[in-house]
Amino acid sequence: MTIERLQQPQPRLRYISALPGRAWQEQRPRTLSILGSTGTIGRSALEVLRLQEGRFHLTALAGARNIPLLAKQAAEFRPEHLGVLEESSIAELRSLLPVGYAPSIVAGQQGFETLATLTGVSTVLSAQVGAAGLRATFAAVRAGKVIALANKESLVLAGDLIRAACSESGACILPVDSEHNAIFQCLAGSFAGSSAPWDADVSRLILTASGGPFFGQNRDALQTVGPDQALAHPNWIMGAKITIDSATLMNKGLEIIEARHLYGLPLSAIEVLVHKESIIHSLVEYTDGSQLAQLGQPDMRVPIAYCLGWPDRLQTDVPRLDLAALGSLSFARPDEQTFPCLDLARQAQEAGRGCPVVLNAANEEAVAAFLDRRIGFYGIADVVAEALEAHTQTSEPASVDEILALDQETRARVRSVIDAHRNRT
């Protein structure tokens, strides 16, 4: 596939935002909203908070459809504000809360935006899944919050807008994704004493990938795999969508785009290395040839704790790493012939013109279709490639509204393509 390339690379590392200032660093308790508390990241964040007595005040929790779990979380942490995705869930949630506990409850994306911009909240953990997290993330940025960002799609879709909004509002981004958090930790020396680390002497970022459940297999072997096999990730416990993205390597493609926006380096300076043990989470190569790596167990509580506690490190009960017991670590280059989604993501980012929006929307719809057994494993990459080929827009979306309009337009087109394919077979 050939996509017209319009973007020019940026020459040096330039972090997306200023870093949190002294007032935030010294705030006790640190006030927090968690958007997506019932998902994998949200649940892990609450595990971290349980060990931090007096250090945080959980002001707001928001979940999507698991209302009983949200009610259980709310009963334990007693936030003043709750959010649900559907208006119809408010009554159910209210009925499950303890007698005498009456928080405010908001609904829908507008409700999530409200919780992201509460006056008394300093920190927002953005942990919604997919493009659905963009509006609330962007609202938090415009409100000048410190955002612990787990919703990578916000940067994939609107990285340039978010960078500009951070500059205007003073918002700060701290990356929760394990790979980008690892890079952030490796850059700690470059960040020291600077609120705006624009010019770290970095030559390369190396994102590690587990390879997913199908590492080492060829295309013929993968033609007939189904959701059950693709969901069997060897190392990480994650939600269904991101687990499928790991199997196709689309997750790593999205992370390349995320890294480009977070760290400002050109795509040519962002590489992927398959490391099936998931112990080294990423590496930074400096201009003198040295490389720094961050190692740890494959457990999201570590990067979550690093973001919530920054610049301090929080206590966690994650099992400690025993390198002697591991014995050895392995590395390989990704097989981009067998896993074409990785290159599709690179092409989309290089092309611009809203192509990353199309890439993400088509992938989300294709993954849903694969999980429903409406398309095969390679149907995911085929659907994404076809959506990119059909995209004719010649300019970048100029606002969040334009981005989400393109997102919806792409989804409608992709659903029609998937339905037409099913009707033919």
Language-model regions, residue ranges each:
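Catalytic, metal-anchored helix/loop core of enzyme active sites in primary metabolism
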Residues: 1-425
